């Protein structure tokens, strides 16, 4: 857990500039935070914000497509809710 916290702190401070081996761009808006065998899929926004989308234990060399698809669904859900909230707020 302390390694995950350290990686999240690094991501918060430096964004996607930290590069590999800490993070890796997978596809589209999806990035992978890589502490040990734990994997945290996230999306990164220009204003130094990110959203954690999926967490899993990596068991193979390649990130499972199902996990990437789950992260994309979660991101779409988040963006839809965010737009709806912004409509109601402003």
Regions found by a protein language model. Give the residues of each.
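Basic, Lys/Arg-enriched alpha-helical interface segments
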Residues: 1-37, 46-50, 57-90
